[in-house]
Amino acid sequence: MPYELYYWDGIQGRGEFIRLALEEAGAAYVDITRETGSGRGTSAMMRILKGADTSDTPFAPPFLKDGELLVSHVANILFYLGPKLGLVPENEGLRYAANGLQLTVTDFVCEVHDTHHPIATELYYEDQKEAAKARSTSFIEHRIPKYLGYFERNLANNPDGDRHSVGNGLSYVDLSLFQVIEGLRYAFPRATQLFARQYPLLVALHDRIRDRPNIARYLASPRRIPFNESGIFRHYPELDQDAA
């Protein structure tokens, strides 16, 4: 039975971190809101979100169904899928380390979102443009170096080598870092132009993942929705600036 992924149609968003893991593993899955028919489409997702409030009712997408089991939140979903897809070490301690790194990615992605919506999510970008400029300047000058510097050091200090974030094999954390680099380059092309020099291990990891057969096929397929100004990583030229 294929996994069922529930996320908003038309954007990569947070659902993309799940898709990359499923695509890399060659797992069978259905992107529910992109399908039509019974039990498909955005209406099917909303029925779950607006259904009876139980202990497993998600607050928001993405969420994943595996048979009768429902799992929500990106890091939680990947913590569940990792062992099943072979995208996390067998060592229990390293699995928790991977989860900690993924939760840090989650924190970073929230800060990315706040560059274009620093005041309120219910307001349009145009209604908070000046605040977004100030937030983006701080993000580029302080938050990108803080987060990417951390992930770069994590690679450098991995006792199993600097090709992977955790252990000696590909993990869902590596795939998520690929997505982070892709998204930052789209949103802030000027600010990221020196990434190869500033974060060589992260960029090398990104490039290796980009060239993996399953990922390369996915990126070239219509399943990979292009970045756009409705998602998390948005390109507004007025928010970008040259790298320091």
Sequence positions of predicted segments:
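GST-like domain detector, emphasizing the conserved glutathione-binding G-site
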Residues: M1-R135, Y236-A244
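A generic, residue-level signal for flexible/boundary positions that often mark functional hotspots
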Residues: A28, P58, K65, L81, ...
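GST-like fold's C-terminal all-alpha helical module
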Residues: G93, A97-D211, A244
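C-terminal anion-handling pockets and recognition modules
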Residues: A216-R217, S221
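Acidic/histidine-enriched, glycine/proline-rich intrinsically disordered or flexible terminal extensions
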Residues: P222-A244
